[in-house]
Amino acid sequence: MESTSCPRKTYAVYNTPYLTEGLTLLPGYGRMQGVVFRRDNPRFQHCQSVAEAMNAAAADPDCLMVNRNAGSGTRALVDRLLEGARPAGYMHQAKSHNAVAVAVAQDRADWGMAIDTVARQYGLGFLPVQPERYDFVIPASRADRPAVRRFVGLLRGETGQRLLRELGFDPSPV
C-alpha cells in the first residue's frame, strides 16, 4: 500500500461548526480516510474504487462492516457515503481507527473506515476516500499555559513536523 499525501486545499473539516465561544481551534495535521479491508478478502481484492468496494459490500448480506461511533467525524463521513443504507454490522461501533483496523484484521468484520496510517500498521487493504484535518480545540483561557505552549511548540517545531511526516501525516497547518 502506498502512502497517501493529503493535499491541503481539499481537507474535509468536521469540527468548526461545534466550536463555541471561548474555544480556539489549533490546526493539527492532515490524514487520509478510507475503506479498510483484509487483503485476502475476495469481495474487495479487485476493487479499484470506494464505489466498487461499497457495492461489493452491499451485494453480500454476509459482508460485515465495523462502524465508527456516532458523533465522530469518521461516522459522519460513513453516513454520507452510505446515503441512508444500513449494511450488516452498521450498529457495531468502534471508538477509534485502531479498533476498526483490529476488528477487520481479526476477521470480526470485513470492512470499515479508518485512516491510511492505521491500515498500513495492520497490513490492511486501503481505498482512499478523502483527506481530512485532525485539529485540536483549546479553551482560550488556557492557551498561555506552559503545557499548551509546549504542545504547540512540539506540533509546529521541526522535530514534531518531521515525526508527523515519518508517520504518514501532513503536518502543514492550514
Walk through the language-model features, giving the residues of each:
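Short, structured loop/turn "capping" segments at alpha-beta junctions
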Residues: 44-47, 84-90
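Short beta-strand-to-loop elements that line the ligand-binding cleft
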Residues: 68, 86-99
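A conserved helix-loop-strand patch within extracytoplasmic ligand-binding domains
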Residues: 15-70, 161-162
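Secondary-structure junction motif
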Residues: 64-82
